[in-house]
UniProtKB/Swiss-Prot annotation:
GO molecular function: beta-carotene 3-hydroxylase activity; hydrolase activity; iron ion binding
Lineage: Eukaryota, Viridiplantae, Streptophyta, Embryophyta, Tracheophyta
Gene source species: Arabidopsis thaliana (Mouse-ear cress)
Cysteine-cysteine disulfides: none
CC terms in the record's Gene Ontology section: chloroplast membrane
Record's protein name: Beta-carotene 3-hydroxylase 2, chloroplastic
Membrane topology: Multi-pass membrane protein
Pfam families named among the record's database cross-references: FA_hydroxylase
């Protein structure tokens, strides 16, 4: 509400001389000295008229509260969405973590059971061949270690050379769940399946060695999948293995391979940090490790 001064009226009325005459002299006692006139003067009467007008005017406080109220509502809505997103992300991570752990234990348990039934079935009714058992376990370890050197050689001599047309998909942003480079995982799985099949259904030292070799290739492939596809390229959550110091170092070394700072080195995976240090990339490796630690901590704090 505001009162506006809309009209000011001023009226000037002349003094009526007819009311005064010589017959009626003005007594000086009637008026005080301050109001005595020397002769007749015109008397001015000032009339001021005020018209009060109501104006509809919003309070400044109301105007200020409107944007604050709007901002507050948007902030509350945004905070609510962020909380829901964080809760959903936390739930998904926990689910994937359980799935990763259960699948790891599942595959490992199946491998142990296959070894147990292979020997119990093959040796049923006879003596256990210590040599065959030792050969199976030795070949499983040897095949797993040998696959690291095979992967290093094939990566450098084949995938980055004659088979680059297929492997190039791995060095480009992936579109979809799969890439052409995944064919190499299938080609490595075929001999492992063949060796396991032959070794499981046949008796003797040679079938035992084949079974061990197939088992070693399988275990290497499973470890490669979790570290390379999961930890390095984040194709799926890997859970607590992301915080294992050496595996973090392995992931950092492989990340340098994709930056091409040392002419593609390292070409191996699990021995990649050693390759990087041999070409003088220890400092760059430490920087990449620090970067990954910061990213991991940031992701953990926001989850």
């Amino acid at each position: 509400m505001a009162a506006g001064l809309s009209t000011i009226a001023v009226t000037l009325k002349p003094l009526n001389r007819s009311s005064f005459s010589a017959n009626h002299p003005i007594s000086t006692a009637v008026f005080p000295p301050s109001l005595r006139f020397n002769g007749f003067r015109r008397r001015k009467i000032l009339t001021v008229c005020f018209v009060v007008e109501e104006r509809k005017q919003s309070s400044p406080m109301d105007d200020d509260n409107k944007p604050e109220s709007t901002t507050s509502s948007s902030e509350i809505l945004m905070t609510s969405r962020l909380l829901k997103k964080a809760e959903k992300k936390k739930s998904e991570r926990f689910t994937y973590l359980i799935a990763a752990v259960m699948s790891s234990f599942g595959i490992t348990s199946m491998a142990i059971m296959a070894v147990y039934y292979r020997f119990s079935w093959q040796m049923k009714g006879g003596e256990v061949s210590v040599l065959e058992m030792f050969g199976t376990f030795a070949l499983s370890v040897g095949a797993a270690v040998g696959m690291e050197f095979w992967a290093r050689w094939a990566h450098r001599a084949l995938w980055h050379d004659s088979l680059w047309n297929m492997h190039e998909s791995h060095h480009k942003p992936r579109e979809g769940a799969f890439e052409l480079n995944d064919v190499f995982a299938i080609t490595n799985a075929v001999p492992a399946i063949g060796l396991l099949y032959y070794g499981f259904l046949n008796k003797g030292l040679v079938p035992g060695l084949c079974f061990g070799a197939g088992l070693g290739i399988t275990m290497f492939g499973m470890a490669y999948m979790f570290v390379h596809d999961g930890l390095v390229h984040k194709r799926f959550p890997v859970g607590p293995i992301a915080n294992v110091p050496y595996l973090r170092k392995v992931a950092a070394a492989h990340q340098l391979h994709h930056t091409d700072k040392f002419k593609g080195v390292p070409y191996g995976l699990f021995l990649g940090p050693k390759e990087v240090e041999e070409v003088g990339g220890k400092e760059e490796l430490e920087k990449e490790i620090s970067r990954r630690i910061k990213l991991y901590n940031k992701g953990s704090s926001t989850s």
